[in-house]
C-alpha cells in the first residue's frame, strides 16, 4: 500500500526537480519509479485486488491465499489515487472493496478482512487488537475517506458515495440513541491518546 503513495509523491517531486534543473536527481527518482511500477504491476497484483505488503520471507499480507487479512482497503484505494495502476485493475480492485469490505447493513467500511488472530508471520501491533477493533478489521476513517476519493476518481461515486456517510461515526445506527456518558468511549481516539488511557473502552464506531 505504501508503495503506491510513495510513487505518487515521487512523481510530483520529479517534476519539481526538473523545474529546478536537478536532472541527476530527477533521473534517479524516475528509475526508482520504474522499478516500483514493475513490482506493483506484477508481484503486488493478486488476481482480484492488490496485496498490502510483503514480509521478509516473501509472504504476502492481503492475499486471497490467506485465511486472515485477505484484502486490505488502503492498497486498493491508493492504487487508484496514485493513478499508477491500469484502469481496469483499478476498477477490479474497487469492486473487490465493495464485495468484501463494504457492509451496508451495519454502515461499516472495513480496513481489512478477515481479522488477524493467529496469522504467521504476524502483522505486528494491529494483530494485537481484538478482531473488529481499529486496524484489525475495524473501520479506520482515513482509509474510508481514501476509498471514497478513489471511487470518485473512477467516476462511480453514485455507487460508493453513500459510504462517505458510513465513514462518519455520527451516522452510526446507534448514534441517535447514544447517551452522554457513552460519548467519551465513542470518540476517545479523536480526542487524544491520553484520553484513551483514561477511558480504556472500545467505541461503537469500530463495530466491535
Placement of each model-derived feature along the sequence:
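Acidic, mature catalytic/reactive cores of soluble proteins
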Residues: 1-162, 169-208
Amino acid at each position: 500500500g505504501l508503495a503506491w503513495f510513495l510513487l505518487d509523491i515521487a512523481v510530483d517531486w520529479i517534476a519539481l526537480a526538473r523545474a529546478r534543473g536537478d536532472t541527476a536527481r530527477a533521473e534517479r527518482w524516475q528509475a526508482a519509479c520504474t522499478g516500483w511500477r514493475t513490482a506493483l504491476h506484477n508481484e503486488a497484483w493478486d488476481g482480484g485486488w492488490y496485496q498490502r505488503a510483503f514480509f521478509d520471507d516473501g509472504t504476502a499480507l492481503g492475499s486471497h491465499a490467506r485465511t486472515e487479512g485477505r484484502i486490505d482497503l488502503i492498497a486498493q484505494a491508493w492504487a487508484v489515487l496514485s493513478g499508477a495502476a491500469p484502469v481496469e485493475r483499478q476498477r477490479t480492485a474497487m469492486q473487490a472493496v465493495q464485495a468484501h469490505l463494504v457492509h451496508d447493513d451495519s454502515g461499516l467500511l472495513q480496513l481489512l478482512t478477515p481479522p488477524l488472530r493467529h496469522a504467521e508471520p504476524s502483522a505486528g501491533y494491529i494483530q494485537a487488537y481484538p478482531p473488529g477493533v481499529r486496524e484489525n478489521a475495524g473501520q479506520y476513517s482515513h482509509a474510508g475517506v481514501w476509498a471514497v476519493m478513489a471511487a470518485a476518481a473512477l467516476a462511480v461515486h453514485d455507487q460508493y458515495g453513500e459510504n462517505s456517510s458510513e465513514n462518519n461515526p455520527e451516522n452510526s445506527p446507534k448514534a441517535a440513541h447514544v447517551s452522554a456518558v457513552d460519548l467519551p468511549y465513542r470518540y476517545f481516539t479523536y480526542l487524544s491518546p491520553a484520553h484513551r488511557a483514561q477511558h480504556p473502552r472500545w467505541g461503537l464506531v469500530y463495530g466491535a
